[in-house]
Amino acid sequence: MNLSQRVKKLKPYVPGEQPQDRKYLKLNTNENPYPPSPQVKKFLQNLDADRLRLYPDHLAIKLREKIGERYGLNKDQVFVSNGSDEALSFCFYALFDSLNGKLLFPEVTYSFYPVYCDYYGIEYEKIPVTRELAIPVEEFVKRKGSCGLVFANPNAPTGTYLTLKDILYLLENYPPEKPVLVDEAYIDFGGESAVPLLRDHKNLLLVRTFSKSMCLAGVRLGFVMAGKELIDALVTVKDSFNSYPVSTLTQKIGEIALSDESYYRSINNKIIAVRESFSSDLGKLGWTVLPSKANFVFTGKQGVPGKEIYMKLKERGILVRHFDAEKVRDFVRITIGTPEDMERLLGQMKTLF
């Protein structure tokens, strides 16, 4: 079969395991351990299925207005998508062109970024992280000949975090005509969003998801906040690919979830508290734990390979995530679950290591 040479060169993103062979405690894909808002459940129980014979609103006006209300923006500053991965994909296609230089992102970050670059033919440079696995803002600023910047904040898979002051410094010292994309998938677990910086920085884009802090990974809903010019570019890409990417159900669930801010604040505060307690407990056991502002921790123990930690826990029915990259191969990423989940995990870690 004759296939495109482009396909033969691609190295697809590898998601976290979703095994079916047994029942695991899943702490490997950063899913929220709590259910969605009770209001979402009520909507689904009373769903008017007749609405599904009609196409969704391709502009997602009500959802975009709702997002705008939450973050102090108007709907023209909001773009919605089938999960934040789709939003990121559209951003890469619409904004980054190797004719304007290489795209920059940290060497340790969300592993979908180089996949998008290969898919769209975008040249890129990975910027080394610090010894503490932090994002080196100064190194980004030095490379003004690049076509743009992309980084997750908090970073994935490390959980390390740039303050609003750090991001402002970067924006003020990087060419204003070049896009700066901040992936804020985990920002609701203790970080401070860069939304206030959108007003004065027209090259800034913030990508968000309903999967993590809003417990809706199975729905697939993401969004971008940026100036109108950048949002219009994303709409052009969307309408050239699929003018109806976000379903009627997804749009309505997103609207309802946004109406129950107090519920989500409550459960995410629980996750933050468990994260801090679990990190402290690991530290007392001699584990290295990176400071995290996400719903996971990145941890390792001297003398124990990360792969071994992953395998031994899997044998005990607990899934965590291991990455093979050189600087992080001695770590594992552990999603924060319920207090009971983390007690079970901690007990196994005491026994095994």
Residue ranges, per PLM feature:
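N-terminal "arm"/small-domain region of PLP-dependent enzymes with the aminotransferase-like
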Residues: 1-54, 145
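Phosphate-binding glycine-rich loop
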Residues: 62-102
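Short acidic capping loops at alpha-helix termini that bridge into adjacent secondary structure
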Residues: 74-78, 101-102, 177, 184, ...
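Conserved PLP-anchoring active-site segment centered on the Schiff-base-forming lysine
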Residues: 94-116
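Active-site phosphate-binding strand-loop segment of PLP-dependent enzymes
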Residues: 125, 130-188
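PLP-dependent enzyme catalytic core of the Aspartate aminotransferase-like
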Residues: 165, 312-316, 321, 325-353
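PLP-dependent aminotransferase class I/II
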Residues: 203-283, 287-290
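Conserved PLP-binding catalytic core of the aspartate aminotransferase-like
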Residues: 272, 284-316
